[in-house]
């Protein structure tokens, strides 16, 4: 007697890694960019649109990861949520932790997560008038959605930073927390 296939709705959330083929992701992501590009007038609007798409994913991803984690408690400390994003979220999204997590030396409310090889910027070729576009705005939106739903409101942006001796720039996700978050964690 063979087992009947399990309906996707009946599968437990705690199982499965949910890995997808990189070429499938690249195709889907390039179609998202094309979709957004057809509906904008200026380049900065495209980053905003990508960020908004990512923002809607953030709370759902946070819930899923909290259910899948063995000791599924929500983080209440600033460094705890940043470490969670740097390791757990990044591993879930990209299969590896981010390359670095740093506190800004210029502002107490700013933190940076760096990735030397951001997959969302890897397979994208842009026209000249959009050459300054950073497709990692999508990832920044996901991070902002996670932080806001975890009660750490922040403004999250993505930036390209040139690295000496490297052909491609690294991506820095800049997280600027609202003042009440810094006061609460002081």
From Swiss-Prot:
Pfam families: TRAPP. GO terms for cellular component: endoplasmic reticulum; TRAPPI protein complex; TRAPPII protein complex; TRAPPIII protein complex. It comes from the Eukaryota. Keywords: Endoplasmic reticulum, ER-Golgi transport, Golgi apparatus, Transport. It is found in: Golgi apparatus, cis-Golgi network; Endoplasmic reticulum. Gene3D superfamilies: Trafficking protein particle complex subunit 3 (3.30.1380.20). One of its GO terms (biological process) is endoplasmic reticulum to Golgi vesicle-mediated transport. Its main location: Golgi. Part of the multisubunit TRAPP (transport protein particle) complex. Belongs to the TRAPP small subunits family. BET3 subfamily. May play a role in vesicular transport from endoplasmic reticulum to Golgi. This is Trafficking protein particle complex subunit 5. It comes from Dictyostelium discoideum. The lineage of its organism: Eukaryota, Amoebozoa, Evosea, Eumycetozoa, Dictyostelia. The gene is trappc5.
């Amino acid at each position: 007697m063979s087992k009947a296939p399990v309906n996707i709705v009946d599968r437990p959330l705690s199982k499965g890694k949910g890995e997808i083929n990189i070429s499938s992701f690249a195709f889907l992501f390039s179609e998202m960019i094309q979709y957004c590009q057809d509906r904008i007038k200026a380049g900065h609007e495209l980053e905003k649109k990508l960020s908004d798409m990512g923002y809607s994913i953030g709370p759902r991803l946070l819930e899923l990861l909290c259910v899948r984690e063995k000791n599924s408690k929500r983080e209440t400390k600033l460094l705890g949520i940043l470490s969670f994003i740097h390791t757990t979220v990044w591993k879930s999204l990209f299969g590896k932790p981010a390359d670095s997590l740093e506190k800004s030396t210029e502002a107490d409310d700013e933190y940076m997560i760096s990735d030397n090889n951001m997959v969302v910027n890897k397979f994208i070729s842009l026209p000249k008038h959009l050459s300054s576009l950073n497709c990692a705005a999508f990832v920044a939106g996901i991070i902002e959605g996670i932080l806001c739903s975890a009660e750490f409101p922040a403004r999250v942006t993505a930036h390209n930073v040139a690295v000496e001796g490297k052909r491609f720039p690294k991506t820095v996700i800049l997280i600027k927390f609202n003042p009440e978050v810094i006061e609460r964690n002081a």
